[in-house]
Amino acid sequence: MKKELYIGLDVHREAVAIAVAEQGRKGEVRDYGQISNDLHALERFITRLRQTHGKRVTLRACYEAGPCGFGVARRLQQLGVECAVVAPSLTPTRAGDRLKTDKRDARKLARLLRAGELSAIYIPEPTDEAIRDLCRARSDAVDDRRRSRNRLKAFLLRHGYRCQESERGKHQELFH
C-alpha cells in the first residue's frame, strides 16, 4: 500500500504554517513549523518531505482561500502534489475552538483533509483569473469615480453651490 501524507497549510502574506498528518485514523498530526511564503521555500519543503518519506509517497495538501490567491496551489500541482483550496466558510469547526493560531489552523486543515471533510473550490486557470481581476479592478474604479463625484457634489452643496435640474447632465464637464 502506498503511503499518503496530508498537508495542512495556513497561508499568509509573509509565512506559511505547515502541519503534516499521516494516513490512517490514528495517524499522528505533526507541526512542521513555518516557511516563508515564496515558491522556492515551498519547493524545498516538498523535496525534503519526499526525501524523508520516499519518492513513492502520495502528497495531498490544502489551504483556505484568501488574499494570497491560487499561486501556491498551482505550484504544488506542478510539483505533483494534489492540492485543494477550501472556502473558510465551509471549513467545519468545533464549538469550543475559539483560540485561532496559525499552527492550530494548519493542524485542523491536515486532520480534516485526511478525514475527507473538506470540499474544494474551483481553481481558475491563470487567464480566467486575470480576466476576473481586470473586471474587479474596473468595477472598483467605477465605484471610486461615483463616490468621488458624490463627495464633490456634497462639498459644493455645503458651500452654497446648487446643481440645477437642467445642469445635472453637464456634470461631465466638471469632472473631466
Predicted segment positions?
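Short, glycine/acidic-enriched loop or turn micro-motifs at the edges of active sites
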Residues: R13, P67, L90
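Gly/Thr-rich phosphate-binding beta-strand-loop-beta motif of the actin/hexokinase/Hsp70
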Residues: K2-E22, L109
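Short, basic/hydrophobic alpha-helical segments
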Residues: L39-R60
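Short glycine-rich, Thr/Ser-proximal phosphate-binding strand/loop in the N-terminal lobe
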Residues: E14-A41
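Short, well-ordered alpha-helical microsegments
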Residues: G69-A73
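Short alpha-helix plus adjacent loop in nuclease-associated cores
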Residues: Q77, A84-R136, D140, H171-H176
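Glycine-rich, often acidic, oxyanion-interacting loops/wings at catalytic, nucleic-acid
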Residues: R136-H176
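Acidic beta-strand-to-loop metal/phosphate-binding motif
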Residues: G8, R56-G66, L109
